[in-house]
Amino acid sequence: MARIKVHELREKSKADLSGQLKEFKAELALLRVAKVTGGAPNKLSKIKVVRKSIAQVLTVISQKQKSALREAYKNKKLLPLDLRPKKTRAIRRRLTKHQASLKTEREKKKEMYFPIRKYAIKV
């Protein structure tokens, strides 16, 4: 079986993809048996192609699942951890802009009673 194009896989339904995955896995099992029994060299070189095809199908399946989850959680308040943006640990623990801008009562009073003086230079 020749290698398949990924754009063709993306157009298929989930049932078609799982069926194709089963076909590839069955073919891989046959090729491995042929390898053990000393099969033709062209079959041995085909193992790599089939393994890559299996990887492609699995990748497309997982990408479809993830995009469906993204759509499901689009307007929700909280997201699952794997759908959140990947940032460094320090950035994730940083205060939010709102939290950083909050001031204590004492700070508010001090700013109210002693505002920053503004000077105009006379020329």
Curated annotation (Swiss-Prot):
Keyword tRNA-binding tagged: no
Biological process per Gene Ontology, one example term: translation
Protein name: Large ribosomal subunit protein uL29y
InterPro entries named in the record: Ribosomal_uL29, Ribosomal_uL29_CS, Ribosomal_uL29_euk, Ribosomal_uL29_sf
Pfam families named among the record's database cross-references: Ribosomal_L29
Molecular function terms from GO: mRNA binding; structural constituent of ribosome
Record's signal peptide: none
Cross-referenced PROSITE patterns: RIBOSOMAL_L29
Gene Ontology annotations for the cellular component aspect, listed alphabetically: cytosolic large ribosomal subunit; cytosolic ribosome; Golgi apparatus
Keyword entries, A-Z: Ribonucleoprotein, Ribosomal protein
Domain of life: Eukaryota
Family of this protein: Belongs to the universal ribosomal protein uL29 family.
